[in-house]
């Protein structure tokens, strides 16, 4: 519900703040007093077109409107989905600068006009001389009938079935449309996956092989060095020279010094043999290496080539293979499951039309009940000559909401054939049609507030009293705000707001005030007799306040 409305520098208003209550709130004032300004302020704040062109009060550089609204689960979900922080209440604000720029805020966060207008659909309905757009929309008429007939749950079940059916149909159509391209992609993916599986590149393999290649290149240098050394120490002349020297020394074996030299030569020979053996072992170990530089080079070349071919890094080739296999299996599955999808499509189609016919039959029954209830309500509103008919025709194509096209038709004069309600009813009549519908549905109200703008134009007396009764009844289910000229309606209010226009020397001002009981009696008396308030009008006003509901 609306908690409060704050307005500053708006049209003829300097500054005001109104606190609303639950129930029935009426707004009254003399003709031309500016009762529509409050409605314009609400529309302005929520991003809708207003009836007034000049929004900013003359001499001011900006206009601002603030609305505080209570929260419900739907509003909370909307705010959460749009990343708007939740507060204890819903705070809505719009500021327009003199240069024309307009800024919208929800809970002090800047939002665009589209978000603000979407939010408005969760807050209230507006019905008046030029604002019965919702009643004229086919979607709204369908919602009214289904809500009245308690058919929303069945319709939701139908919508889920329809969505599943359409998903299957779209999948079948996609396969049929892309049969050739799917088969071509399967051929391509078969080639890709076979090539990748054959090469079997592992994550980190390129780096590992690069390091091994570097080691092998260094070992090649070591191998050449060992071969050169081995060639030198394995020279037969070295052994021959040592042998000759030892034979010469043997002739002088009695000489201790020569004996020591002979020992040294023997040790040199042994050390040389050991060096030869060590070098031979090194050469043998090199020949036993697991890695071959030429093979490593070939493997690295193959990895780099396939990486370039598919524009994928070497480490990502394994993931690329997995993705390609998944895509390949998915496409093969689509082809293989085409027959199965067609079976599912037929099953869902049968289920949809079964639910659709069930919903259609229940809509026909609900339509008859709604027509009866509405005719009763229209009689209460002194529209005895009006007729109302819910036209239900079978659709040519299935839809999420069913197999029916639903149009509200009416006639307001005898002898007239019923036509679409927007073609035959005036603004006031549309408002009373909507009031009759809302009264019929008052236990199923979903919007926190309803605003009626001059719903009682062109009526009076008993009709106005009946309109007031219906508004009062409706206000027991949701907050109702009414701009009215009728004392019979105003007398039933839980909150009575009066708007006055004052002509000063240099400007015109509009003031807004919530009336107490005595002030309400004076205002009702004025509404009854005009500016010249009489004892009779005061008495009648008191009677209306004492007996607000007949």
From Swiss-Prot:
SUPFAM superfamilies: P-loop containing nucleoside triphosphate hydrolases (SSF52540)
GO MF entry, a single one: ATP binding
Taxonomy, superkingdom: Bacteria
Entry keyword set: ATP-binding, DNA damage, DNA repair, Nucleotide-binding
UniProt-annotated binding residues for ATP: 29-36
Pfam families associated with the record: SMC_N
InterPro entries noted in UniProt: DNA_recomb/repair_RecN, P-loop_NTPase, RecF/RecN/SMC_N
GO biological process, one term: DNA repair
Gene Ontology cellular component terms for the protein in this record: bacterial nucleoid
Function of the protein: May be involved in recombinational repair of damaged DNA.
Family designation: Belongs to the RecN family.
Name of the protein in question: DNA repair protein RecN
């Amino acid at each position: 519900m609306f908690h409060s409305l704050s307005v500053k520098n708006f049209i003829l208003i300097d500054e005001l703040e109104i606190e609303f209550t639950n129930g029935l709130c009426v707004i009254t004032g003399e003709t031309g007093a500016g009762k529509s300004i409050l409605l314009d302020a609400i529309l302005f704040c929520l991003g809708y077109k207003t009836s007034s062109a000049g929004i900013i009060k003359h001499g001011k550089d900006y206009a601002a409107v603030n609305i505080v609204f209570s929260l419900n689960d739907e509003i909370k979900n909307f705010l959460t989905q749009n990343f708007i922080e939740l507060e204890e209440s819903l705070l809505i604000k719009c500021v327009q600068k003199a240069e024309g720029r307009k800024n919208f805020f929800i809970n002090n966060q800047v939002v665009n006009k589209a978000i603000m207008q979407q939010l408005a659909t969760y807050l209230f309905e507006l019905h008046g001389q030029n604002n019965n757009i919702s009643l004229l929309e086919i979607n709204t008429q369908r919602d009214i009938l289904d809500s009245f007939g308690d058919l929303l749950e069945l319709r939701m079940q139908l919508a889920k079935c329809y969505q599943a059916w359409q998903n299957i149909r779209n999948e079948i159509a996609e396969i049929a449309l892309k049969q050739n391209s799917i088969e071509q992609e399967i051929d391509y993916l078969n080639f890709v996956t076979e090539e990748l599986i054959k090469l079997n590149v592992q994550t980190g393999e390129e780096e590992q092989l690069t390091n091994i290649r570097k080691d092998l290149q260094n070992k090649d240098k070591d191998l050449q060095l060992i071969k050169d050394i081995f060639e030198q120490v394995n020279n037969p002349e070295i052994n021959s020279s040592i042998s000759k020297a030892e034979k010469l020394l043997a002739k002088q074996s009695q000489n201790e010094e020569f004996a020591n030299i002979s020992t040294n030569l023997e040790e040199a020979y042994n050390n040389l043999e050991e060096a030869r053996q060590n070098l031979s072992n090194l050469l043998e170990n090199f020949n036993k290496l697991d890695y071959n530089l030429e093979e490593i080079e070939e493997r690295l070349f193959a990895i780099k080539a396939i990486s370039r071919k598919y524009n994928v890094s070497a480490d990502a080739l394994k993931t690329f293979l997995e993705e390609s296999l998944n895509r390949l299996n998915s496409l093969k599955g689509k082809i293989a499951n085409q027959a199965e999808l067609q079976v599912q499509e037929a099953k869902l189609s049968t289920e949809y039309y079964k639910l659709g016919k069930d919903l259609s039959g229940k809509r026909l029954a609900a339509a008859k009940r709604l027509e009866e209830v509405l005719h009763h309500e229209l009689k209460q509103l002194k529209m005895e000559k009006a007729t109302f008919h819910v036209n239900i025709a079978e659709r040519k194509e299935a839809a999420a909401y069913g197999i029916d096209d639903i149009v509200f038709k009416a006639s307001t004069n005898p002898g007239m054939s019923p036509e679409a309600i927007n073609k035959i009813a005036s603004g006031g009549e549309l408002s009373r049609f909507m009031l009759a519908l809302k009264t019929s549905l008052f236990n199923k109200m979903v919007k926190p507030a309803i605003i009626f703008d001059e719903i009682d134009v062109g009526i009076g007396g008993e009709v106005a009293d009946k309109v007031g009764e219906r508004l009062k009844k409706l206000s027991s289910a949701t907050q109702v705000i009414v701009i009215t000229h009728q004392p019979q309606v105003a007398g039933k209010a839980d909150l009575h707001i009066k708007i006055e226009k004052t002509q000063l020397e240099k400007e015109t001002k509009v003031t807004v005030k919530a009336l107490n009981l005595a002030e309400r009696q004076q205002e009702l008396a004025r509404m009854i007799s005009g500016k010249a308030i009489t004892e009779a009008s005061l008495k009648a006003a008191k009677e209306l306040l004492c007996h607000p509901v007949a």
